[in-house]
Amino acid sequence: MNLVAALVLCFALLSSVRGDDTTNTIDHDQVKPFPQPEPVTISEKAAVKYKPQLEIGDGCVSFPAVNAAGEITGGLKGTKDTEACTEAPLGSQVYGRSTWFQDKWAMMYSWYFPKNFCAYKAAGRHDWANVVIWIDNPAAENVTFLGASLSQQTLEPIKLAILPMGTRNEEPYQNQKAIPMMAFAGAERITTGRVGRWSYTYKYVAGSNTTMRFSHSYPGTWGWIDMTFADSDGESQDLIMWNQLTDKARAALESADFGDTQVPFTDKNFDTNLQAAWPF
């Protein structure tokens, strides 16, 4: 092959790769979410019945990450705080996947955010967060909630001068077998009296027996934004299960590069994450 032919071939290959990237990545606010299908199987019905609410305590609202054609969100540069991500104009999405894991039924719910946040400011492009809800049997009319595992980022905190703004999480999940009453939608804490200058008495009103509520917010310390239990109700998004996605959407999520964060429910990540989320 002469030099000219080699250069032409290289240019064609580079153009092909560049064209594929452009075709498969679109603006974060142009990704159309999947409508929630009517559940058919036992696992789909359970996933819809126990779909949690998401409250946005800090950072961006959740956005869809992929459309039916397999086009992936390009996210947003980690600057300018919540600019361009306070509302998902086409609607949001929660992604689900469930399975038996050892002798428990695991339901993973995942959300995508176009910016990541650390130390109360935008600090990166892309963020995936998820929770795993553990129950005894998806076919039961009234299930027993066995635990909940909330994802947390294990990245090194950003630094101000030479000081890290927070501490690094050692584990990718906060795993809990005891689920607080206030973690359920509709639950209330009502102040009933005052017993000191800063002390009060409360009564608690139970909420839903099917729907939990989680918050995407800072967990009370400096560091990266994470999943926490919410004390107030959030919103529900259309749920799409892994096996309900189009083939193109699944393939795109499997191969997409989301930088420092990963799609938690893909074939290459799902089992590993369930192992890390195991609270028993």
Swiss-Prot record:
Q: Which cellular compartments is it found in?
A: Secreted
Keywords from UniProt, A to Z, are: Glycoprotein, Secreted, Signal, Virulence
Which residues does UniProt assign to the signal peptide?
1-19
Has keyword Secreted? yes
| Annotated motif Hepta-peptide GHRHDWE motif, positions | 123-129
According to the lineage, what is the superkingdom? Eukaryota
GO CC annotation terms, alphabetical: extracellular region
The answer, when asked if GTP-binding is one of the entry's keywords, is no
Q: What is its main location?
A: secreted
User: Which positions are glycosylated?
Assistant: N142, N209
Q: Which InterPro entries match?
A: NPP1
Specify one Pfam family: NPP1
Q: What is known of its domains?
A: Key residues/motif important for the effector activities are degenerated in most NLPs, including the nlp24 peptide consisting of the conserved region I (11-aa immunogenic part) and conserved region II (the heptapeptide GHRHDWE motif) that is important for phytotoxic activity.
Family named by the database record: Belongs to the Necrosis inducing protein (NPP1) family.
Role description: Secreted effector that contributes strongly to virulence during infection by P.capsici.
Q: What protein does this entry describe?
A: NLP effector protein Pc553546
What organism does the record attribute this protein to?
Answer: Phytophthora capsici
